[in-house]
């Protein structure tokens, strides 16, 4: 990539000078958007997953759960997959202010990244913009233009009937040197250099003869030519391509202006993406949510009971049957980088999250009756080998409710399912349940052994005394 491109990680501290070198005068703008914040020590932390481009440099921010020791190829591969997820997610969900998924190619807020993705993908499917003109050949192979033939060619008459032994035929030619075709070639080269590798278009080949085109010197003129072409074009693909080229010219102008430029494609709330992915691949059944009781609001004056419109809403509820046994899953997708470091716990959900999840268990008690129930938090993992890895549990010892199981889910595997429009099979779900059961048994054995050893140690001390 010709542009300077760097990978960073969400929620990791970075030296301020390092970020300034890459993003220059855009720090204040990023802070105002809540994408970047400064901690008490002066380090900068990204609260964002996605792409940031300032015209000269491009940075890619990976999710906080990712392995910090990934090589460059692995980072690019992962980010390419995340971009596909963003496109699918934004197409299915209404974008919020915290998301930067604008896809309208003539919008001031559309990302350079989206322009590149459109231009390169469109070229791979349709080739260059085609500016056509019509010429006429006598006795050619094209469609006969009878009006021109009758007006300009003398017929031979036989018994009063005219016979045309020659005709004018239309021949449609492509103007490969038209200005818009040249602008298209320039834009393809520019955006391929900036984003081609990360977007996975490494094998794309095109004419680079217009790389040195002086866009800045004639930006207004080029823009007016494209605008005129848009007015006279009625093919949807051509109109969309022309708008993308016009935006590319405008961005080139802005890049060299004195005001800061910033292009974003991503989200400040990746947890919504993680929730959507998990909800989809686990085949969440929303009908169960509708059956959960709603709060009762009682007016003591006239003893009137009002039902709240909203109720508890777990992320994922899934019931399934396997080998004549029924199972009931209550799951919550948690985008946390949780870590047990000896006795130290980091990146864990709050008390409110635990309380809600235990309350879901209670609220779904009747619906899950007769089924084997499991309640779990789902955390993303960079481990691509194990689909599910149970690593702990959380509960309140004063509540008579089963603990919430803590499970790492392979992010790569669920991303693949999501992009392929697939879900976990019944076998997969049973494997999920089996992993929880095996982990609980191991924990029970370890706990029993620990308490047994403590008892023996205490007894020996007592006997000595």
From Swiss-Prot:
What keywords are annotated for this sequence in UniProt?
Endonuclease, Hydrolase, Nuclease, Restriction system
Q: Which GO terms describe its biological process?
A: DNA restriction-modification system
Q: What happens when the gene is disrupted?
A: Not essential; its disruption results in increased transformation by plasmid DNA carrying multiple BsuMI target sequences. Triple deletion ydiO-ydiP-ydjA leads to loss of susceptibility to MspJI, which only digests C-methylated DNA.
Q: Which domain of life is it from?
A: Bacteria
Q: Name one GO molecular function term.
A: type II site-specific deoxyribonuclease activity
So what does this thing catalyse?
Endonucleolytic cleavage of DNA to give specific double-stranded fragments with terminal 5'-phosphates
Q: Which InterPro entries match?
A: Restrct_endonuc_II_LlaJI
Q: What is its EC number?
A: 3.1.21.4
Induction or repression: Constitutively expressed during exponential growth. Encoded in an operon with ydiR and ydiS.
Assembly, per entry: BsuMI restriction activity requires YdiR, YdiS and YdjA.
- Function summary: A P subtype restriction enzyme that recognizes the double-stranded sequence 5'-CTCGAG-3'; the cleavage site is unknown.
Query: What is the protein name for this chain?
Result: Type II restriction enzyme BsuMI component YdjA
């Amino acid at each position: 990539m010709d542009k300077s491109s760097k990978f960073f990680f969400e929620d990791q501290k970075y030296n301020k000078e390092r970020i300034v070198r890459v993003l220059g005068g855009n720090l204040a703008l990023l802070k105002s958007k809540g994408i970047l914040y400064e901690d008490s020590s002066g380090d900068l932390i990204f609260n964002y997953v996605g792409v940031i481009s300032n015209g000269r440099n491009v940075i890619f921010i990976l999710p906080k759960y990712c392995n910090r020791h990934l090589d460059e190829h692995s980072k690019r591969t992962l980010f390419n997959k995340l971009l596909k997820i963003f496109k699918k997610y934004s197409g299915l969900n209404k974008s919020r202010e915290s998301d930067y998924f604008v896809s309208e190619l003539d919008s001031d807020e559309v990302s350079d990244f989206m322009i590149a993705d459109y231009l390169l993908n469109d070229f791979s499917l349709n080739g260059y913009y085609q500016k056509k003109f019509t010429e006429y050949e006598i006795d050619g192979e094209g469609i006969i233009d009878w009006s021109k033939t009758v007006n300009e060619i003398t017929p031979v008459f036989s018994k009063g009937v005219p016979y045309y032994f020659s005709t004018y035929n239309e021949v449609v030619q492509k103007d490969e040197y038209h200005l818009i075709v040249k602008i298209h070639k320039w834009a393809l080269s520019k955006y391929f250099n900036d984003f081609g590798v990360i977007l996975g278009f490494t094998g794309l080949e095109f004419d680079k003869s217009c790389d040195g085109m002086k866009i800045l010197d004639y930006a207004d003129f080029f823009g007016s030519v494209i605008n005129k072409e848009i007015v006279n074009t009625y093919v949807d693909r051509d109109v969309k391509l022309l708008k993308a080229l016009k935006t590319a010219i405008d961005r080139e102008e802005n890049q060299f202006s004195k005001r800061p430029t910033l292009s974003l494609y991503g989200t400040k709330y990746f947890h919504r993406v993680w929730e959507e992915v998990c909800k989809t691949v686990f085949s969440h059944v929303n009908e169960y949510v509708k059956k959960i009781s709603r709060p009762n609001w009682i007016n003591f004056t006239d003893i009137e009971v009002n039902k709240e419109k909203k109720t508890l809403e777990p992320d994922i509820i899934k019931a399934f049957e396997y080998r004549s046994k029924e199972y009931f899953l209550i799951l919550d997708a948690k985008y946390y980088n949780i870590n047990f470091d000896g006795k130290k716990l980091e990146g864990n959900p709050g008390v409110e999250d635990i309380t809600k999840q235990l309350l879901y268990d209670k609220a779904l008690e009747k619906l899950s009756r007769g089924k084997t129930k499991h309640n779990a938090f789902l955390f993303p993992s960079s481990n691509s080998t194990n689909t599910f890895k149970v690593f702990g549990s959380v509960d309140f010892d004063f509540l008579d409710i089963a603990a919430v199981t803590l499970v790492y889910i392979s992010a790569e595997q669920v991303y693949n399912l999501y992009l392929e429009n697939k879900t976990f099979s019944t076998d997969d779900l049973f494997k999920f349940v089996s992993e929880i059961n095996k982990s609980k048994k191991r924990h029970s054995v370890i706990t029993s052994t620990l308490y047994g050893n403590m008892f023996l140690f205490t007894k020996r001390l007592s006997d000595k005394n």
